[in-house]
Amino acid sequence: MASASTENGEELMNYGSNSDSEESEYSENEDTQVCDKDSQQNSNADSGYPLDSPELQDSKTTGQKGQNKSGKTSIGAVHPNYGFGKRWSKSEDVLLKQLVETHGENWEIIGPHFKDRLEQQVQQRWAKVLNPELIKGPWTRDEDDMVIKLVRNFGPKKWTLIARYLNGRIGKQCRERWHNHLNPNIKKTAWTEKEDEIIYQAHLELGNQWAKIAKRLPGRTDNAIKNHWNSTMRRKYDVERRSVNASGSDLKSSRTHLITLIKSGGISKCMNNMQHNKESGGEAVNKSENADGASVTAVKGGDLAQESQDDHQKGSNLAHLSMQHLIKLTMPRQTPIILKRTRKHIPETHHQAGCSSSETFNQEEAAGNARSRPPSSPVISPIKSLPFSPSHFLKSPCLTTFEDMDLRASTPVTKVYNRVGMEIKKEMETSSIETPHKSQLGPRTPTPFKKALAAIGKKRDGRRYEPSSPSSLVEDLAEIIHEEHLSNSLTANNSKMMGAADQNSTLSTEYNAQSPPHMKRARKSLLSTWSSNHPYNAGSAKRIQPFETETPSKFLTSPGDILKDTLCSEQDLPFDEGRKENRPFHNRRINKYRGGLTYDHVIDPKWARVACGKSRDQMFMEEQAYACLKNLSCISRSLNFEKQKCLVNSFDRFGSL
């Protein structure tokens, strides 16, 4: 009874079972990419029991009948989906192994221990997955020869019968081995472009139904086609498919938007606006600046009484315009604010004398309405320019604008009014944070003048000096420079009365003590006259200091003594912070050494003899050195080290002598 049920179950369930565990267990090294075609179509492959298996369909039919002839209700009759779609757990596998070890393959006793499984499910789980006698390794040459021989005898469909002659193999393994590797009708050559095209077109129609695709390619198995698609073709054709889908979605969205605008009455409003412009006959502006600075030309209307016939003809021509003419009037794409450059404001030109006052009033009223009209809350963003004409037509300014349709979107945008007479906002040319132009800056005051003005402010008890006129400022500065010049001349006269021996140190000390501050010396460069021109120097024979003279290049007729005084010695130079010779302490130390030390030009002959190496011992050592060098230069190099040692010893003896 048990053996009969086993044969029937194996015969019925052979093509239906497709668990992943089985597939991984008996797959060969060369079959690593092999998968069963049924595993793709069944989502419950891991359970080992597909929904379309014959025996499970039989159980459904029995469940629909209700009861058996014996009158007892079966499990499948009460629960038509009993145990389906539920994977086997590890605990169930362990329990099944223990029960088989205890009771053997007696499924009538083992089956009731699994409340959520049918007896046939338990039997198939053991026979196809858990049986330790199953061979799940690679196929041998003997097994392949046996499969080929059995297929010739029984045909390529009796896989359960063929599996009985192969110990450890089941019918599914034999079937996959034959169809994927052993069948002589299988093509194992490289894939051609024609086959790739057939697979691509079939995949577009059928999807992943590899068995149906294999029927269109004789000599190729479904498994080989699937592996070729996943490994090679998907990367190549997915990019093309995405581009086709993207262009199709754009075309679909543009068509939908066009239909929406047509239904909302945009075209009818466009024609009404054109008719209204023809009847009103106002004057249009010759050129108007739009958002991007592009000029749009319009018709200039003159006297209505004289040109009524021409306007009528023009209006009739506008009524018969095609869409291609309307595309030329499309509003250009607005430049983002962050990319706009500051433009200088161009004043509006006056209207010509021939324009009537009523026409001017109409234009101002239209511009005022455009400015006073507030932008509504977020409206839909303007569509981007597409390569075909519907989008250009929809962006025409004469059509119903998106703002008038009150379409809401997540991104708020500002309205772009393309009205005649619309004024452009004047942008600020300068800002407080911008650097002003050089021409706008006032004259800069030189540093010596600033210091002189600060000195005048000190004399005025800290009050700021404000001259009444430029001439008074010059007079005050000349007075300050004159006073400083007198003080310096007195200091120089006093310094000349010092003794000749201490002249250098005394001059530097007196100069550092009584010389004017550093900031006052800069003002002496402002003297515009030489000492000969000053009245207080006319009767005195005072020597002009070098720092009191002007630059010689400014006075080409300067006397020679002034130029001579300009190139003075170091001791007559003004105090310089960077020169150590002008410091008091340094000067005193130098003068002390100059006055106390006396240089003797006569050299002691004994000291010269020792210093120049002319003593007796030095000359003896020099002769020995010359002798050693002379002997060593004549000896050729050799590899006889003992000979060299003898020479060295002889030299040592010669040196010791």
UniProtKB/Swiss-Prot annotation:
Residues 1-78, 348-382, 429-448 are annotated as: Disordered. DNA-binding protein that specifically recognizes the sequence 5'-YAAC[GT]G-3'. Component of the DREAM complex, a multiprotein complex that can both act as a transcription activator or repressor depending on the context. In follicle cells, the complex plays a central role in the site-specific DNA replication at the chorion loci. During development, the complex represses transcription of developmentally controlled E2F target genes. Residues 159-182, 210-233 bind DNA. GO terms for cellular component: DRM complex; euchromatin; Myb complex; nucleus. The modification Phosphoserine is found at residues 381, 389, 396, 558, 569. Residues 371-382 have a biased composition (Low complexity). It comes from Drosophila melanogaster. Residues 59-73, 354-363 have a biased composition (Polar residues). SMART domains: SANT. Residues 87-130, 131-186, 187-237 form the HTH myb-type domain. PROSITE patterns: HTH_MYB (PS51294). One of its GO terms (biological process) is positive regulation of mitotic cell cycle. Residues 20-33 have a biased composition (Acidic residues). GO terms for molecular function: DNA binding; DNA-binding transcription activator activity, RNA polymerase II-specific; DNA-binding transcription factor activity; DNA-binding transcription factor activity, RNA polymerase II-specific; RNA polymerase II cis-regulatory region sequence-specific DNA binding. The gene is Myb. This is Myb protein. Pfam families: Cmyb_C, Myb_DNA-bind_6, Myb_DNA-binding. PANTHER family: MYB PROTEIN-RELATED. It is found in: Nucleus; Chromosome. Keywords: Activator, Chromosome, DNA-binding, Nucleus, Phosphoprotein, Repeat, Repressor, Transcription, Transcription regulation. Component of the DREAM complex at least composed of Myb, Caf1-55, mip40, mip120, mip130, E2f2, Dp, Rbf, Rbf2, lin-52, HDAC1/Rpd3 and l(3)mbt. The modification Phosphothreonine is found at residues 445, 447, 557, 566.
